[in-house]
Amino acid sequence: MYKVMKFKSIIAATLIGSTLFTTSCKDDFADLNTNPSNISKPNVSYLFTDGLLKFESAGYLLWFYNGRYTSQFVQAYVPTGGLTGTFNQMGAAGGQGSQALQVLKLAREVDDILKYMDPKEAAKYEHIRVMFKPLLVYLGMFDTDVYGDMPYTEAAMAPYTSPMLLTPKYDSVAELYNIWLSELDETINVLSKPVVVGSETIPQTSLGSQDFLYKGDATKWAKLANSIKLKIAVRLLHQDKAKAIKIAEEVANSPVGVINGFNDDFILNKGVMNFHFGDDVSAYGAPTKQVVDFLIENRDPRVRFFYTKNDFNSKVVQAFFDAGRDLPAYIAENVEFEVVNGKKVFKSWKGVGEPWVRYYGLPNEIDAAQKGEYLDYFTTQRWKISLPGTTEKTFYPYSTFNQEMVRGQFDYTIPTVPGGPVIEDKEDRPWYGMFLSTAEVNLYFAEFSLLGANLPKTAEEYYNIAVERSVLEYDKLASLNKIPYYGTTYAYDDNESVIDLKDGEIANLKAKADYKFSGTTAEKLEKVYIQQYLHFMYQPTDQFVTVRRSGVPKVNSSLIAWQPIIESTNIPRRFEISLPDETDLMFDIKTASLKSQGFTGGQGITPSLLNTERVWQDKGAPNFGAGPNF
């Protein structure tokens, strides 16, 4: 008995509309159901592949809206025009709040198909059935991190209920964490043991290339499920520390293991022609000066993968000399020149040289663009030059968000002097995104070890593995996504260097005082959180959650210091949730959900309310910049 998809199309809009969180720029759900003429018999393997395709926690709207907010709230990025006094005010949002629903609809369809199969036939798909669950839990956490309670246990059930369930209840985050832990445990159990019906062992349907993450490898999916439990555990620390530690110990001692190495990492590519998205997200901005300075001071190779080089290669520097224009002071400090016949001639880069001298952040201060000491960072006219017979060109002295780390269709133009050649990198590359990795798992283990968990390795061992793996993982992503200057200098400037990871760099990095696992327990814990903060530079919600629950970066730190640009109590810790319309079938349920969480609904909410009205998992956590309070 297979239901016709057309029936589901009729009710889908009502169901989905009743479960959205976000206030505007909501995802378009109109095309989520397949034309019934294209389906004669549902295919379970296809539905799983479709679920993997619809897995998305790093889409265009996230980078354009939600991620941009959180990255500024946690002082990782600033707008290229500088911060203003309204940076803490919420506006349009998107890319988050209903992402789990996209995959849940397909999981529900699979459950329904299997329900009407012969038990032995249905058992052939047990692995596929449970492989949906790690995806759902991951996206569910992603949605609830900034919006709180959501429909889950009754969501997307309308096509399979009579009367149709059009008003799903909101499950609390506390309930969801328990549900998700149970679902992950079920996944681990099913994937690590034979599937048996009666006394007969049932062979499992092979996904092969239809699973473009792990090729249907049950052991890897079990590791993923086990590793995701750590993401729940760290979010539980301020509500039930003992339970969180117990979960971490169970994960570490589970016979299925955890993500360990490139072959296990949740690095997703959806196809050779899947470029993720093509829209510009340059508005994400530039890195903050304090973060870039920390990375450069410690020669952290990730600075080259996180951010773009600025436009001031040695030929551009020489063009500024030829035009009689001053270089930005912070760039001039790194230039060695000589005077020949009364003219400045570029000689070499000072200090550590290329590529390090090409990375600069912007000051993280309110209205910095209006302050005289920062003219070299924000006054565009200072970066414009022309040479005789050429058109004026602008050269940007700071680094920016590296768009090719999030989208494969991006054309990069190499900075050349006025009148110089036009050199472009226009190759489209299939996009690879990192969602959970060996580094993240080991950073969580290091944290839990310092908090008292009894784990197989020491906190130092986990920490050192994490630092090394994070660098290797970002180097791999940079290579896979072929970001500018990876593997090529474009043969323009003889003083240009590639950004590829070099032998010995990781060992040198781990020897730096700021990266060594040394000091008091509190100092070690801060280092773990700083590494989480850096590792999540391209997972903005995880970065936000880390800062929110740890209070790191913290004020007056000798590592990366929190800048007290405004009172921390005026920085949002959750996102706005729109008030339901009285005609909404879910009006009473949504209103009750807001009330039960203590949330003020609507738009234009005072930032201080978004700070004090916290999602459940955030209650009791330190304020921004205050440091850990365990």
Task: Give residue ranges: language-model regions.
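Bacterial Sec-dependent N-terminal signal peptides
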Residues: 1-34
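Short, compositionally biased low-complexity segments
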Residues: 22-28, 72-83, 148-156, 484, ...
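Membrane-proximal, proline-rich intrinsically disordered regions
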Residues: 25-79, 86, 105-109, 115-119, ...
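Structured, solvent-exposed acidic/aromatic patches
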Residues: 42, 76-135, 139-473, 521-523, ...
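Beta-strand acidic-aromatic groove motif in beta-rich domains, primarily in extracellular
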Residues: 62-70, 148-150, 244-245, 542-545
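C-terminal functional modules
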Residues: 442, 449-453, 468-630
